[in-house]
Design a protein with these regions (language model features):
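Hydrophobic membrane-insertion alpha-helices, especially the h-region
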Residues: 2-23
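Short, low-complexity intrinsically disordered segments
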Residues: 16-17, 26, 94, 165, ...
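Short linear interaction motif-like sites in intrinsically disordered regions of transcription factors
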Residues: 19-20, 29, 97, 168, ...
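Extracytoplasmic low-complexity, Pro/Thr/Ser/Ala/Gly-rich segments
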Residues: 21-113, 212-291, 374, 388-407
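Generic structural motif
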Residues: 82-84, 105, 154-158, 171-177, ...
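Long acidic/polar interaction regions in large eukaryotic complex-forming proteins
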Residues: 106-136
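A short, solvent-exposed beta-edge/loop patch
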Residues: 130-210, 315-407
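Flexible, solvent-exposed loop/hinge segments that line or gate ligand/substrate-binding clefts
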Residues: 260-347
């Protein structure tokens, strides 16, 4: 009887090796592909746990899609899978599904808010999900496609150059319906991407010789909140708008697109949107005025809006706004200054905890022709004052009232 049992166990083991061997080889090969593409910075195990990571994993065969540790930052790596290819029905049988990116600050990369013809909302009426703070004691954000984190590093060097901060991003590439739910990532993918971003940044910090490390990523990251919503419900980055009851003015937005506040973030935004009915009522009220004869009625949801940003720290030094003249270089706001970019962009500045902050306002095309200048100024001042108070900022500089008038 014992001999029979031993034979059965041996046969079972052989069968396990027979069936498991190809899977083990596929996993080993996938890990090799991830390490080769991402310079050993991106942890392979949580990447392979992502929803689109099934099947065969490969990476882009070019310098622009691989991380090379001895080259300048920023860099990124791009991974492909047959699982993503099959679900999306690609002709090649594979599809780009993951991007890991790393970088350092200070950087010369321009930071640009929306211009007047950009859209804040999905033009087809689907929900819009503004990024939220990551939480967990980590300076970072969660978007509808990935997670970005940041770490101070005053004692490190990247490719021989001193740095002040490092950052890392882990994201899915246009996950779409096969790998998302109602326009959002699956909860398991949000958590995995946060883990990947944090571990990638810690690996980069070790390579750069930084002393500090990030704590473990949160393990139960909440879903993003869909927007826009009525201004009466604002309790985050647009709470100031509700408290001032600006929405009671028919010429101002009645909806908000906001996130939770986090005073440590490099970019914090409040979006103010005119709902479809209010936008059309406002257009009808000015359509007969010859001064507004070139203003067309809004043709899509959320087309008329005001977007407000606060850029902090190193990022504030790289803000660029469109200039009034088409042939002129971009306007580069500096700490201690305030003014106007093109006809629909303004900036203010302040100093918070010894670090520069640049505050910007963009008014969308069309709406910039009908919003009264004094109301635009009042909005911007109220926004900047709120942020400055919340962040204990000083030396706040506002644009002159004349900067809000076009004539």
């Amino acid at each position: 009887m014992r001999k029979i049992s031993n034979v059965v166990l041996c046969l079972t083991a052989v069968a396990g090796i027979w069936w498991g061997g190809p899977l083990l080889l596929q996993t080993w090969t996938a890990r090799q592909q991830i390490n080769e593409a991402c310079g050993g910075l991106v942890p392979a195990v949580p990447v392979l746990a992502l929803s689109p990571a099934g099947g065969t994993i490969s990476h882009r065969q070019s310098d622009s899609g691989t991380i090379q540790l001895e080259a300048d930052l920023p860099q990124h790596c791009e991974l492909f899978s047959t699982e993503a290819g099959e679900k999306h029905g690609t002709s090649s049988g594979e599809r780009w599904f993951f991007t890991g990116a790393v970088g350092a600050l200070p950087s010369k990369t321009p930071v640009t808010p929306e211009d007047s013809q950009d859209r804040l909302l999905d033009p087809y009426g689907d929900p819009t999900y503004p990024p939220e703070p990551l939480g967990g004691g980590i300076v970072g954000t969660v978007s509808d496609s990935g997670v970005t984190v940041e770490l101070p590093c005053s004692d490190g060097r990247a490719n021989g150059k001193p740095v002040k901060k490092l950052w890392a991003r882990a994201s899915l590439t246009e996950p779409g319906r096969p790998f998302s739910e109602k326009g959002q990532l699956f909860s398991s993918d949000r958590n995995a991407l946060a883990d990947i971003a944090v571990r990638t940044l810690n690996n980069l910090a070790e390579h750069a010789g930084c002393t500090d490390r990030l704590p473990d990523a949160p393990t139960d990251i909440p879903a993003l909140t869909a927007g826009p919503e009525g201004a009466a419900h604002a309790n985050g980055t647009c709470e100031w708008y509700r408290k001032k009851d600006f929405a009671g003015d028919e010429k101002l937005p009645d909806q908000v697109l906001e996130s939770r506040t986090d005073n440590r973030l490099w970019d914090e935004r409040c979006g103010l949107v005119l709902g479809e009915e209010r936008a059309h009522r406002l257009w009808e009220s000015v359509a007969a005025d010859r001064r507004h004869s070139t203003v067309h009625p809004p043709s899509s949801i959320g087309e008329w809006y005001v977007s407000l940003h606060t850029y902090a720290g190193e990022g504030a030094e790289n803000v660029q706004l469109d200039s009034i003249g088409y042939d002129e270089p971009p306007v580069e706001p500096e700490p201690g200054t305030a003014g106007r970019g093109d006809e629909s962009m303004w900036w203010a500045s302040s100093v918070c905890a010894g670090k520069p902050q640049i505050h910007t306002m963009t008014v969308s095309y069309g709406y910039d022709k009908v919003i009264p200048p004094e109301r635009a100024e009042k909005l911007f001042r109220a926004y900047v004052t709120d942020v400055a108070s919340r962040r204990s900022c000083t030396d706040t500089q506002f644009p002159a009232s004349s900067a809000f008038h076009t004539d």
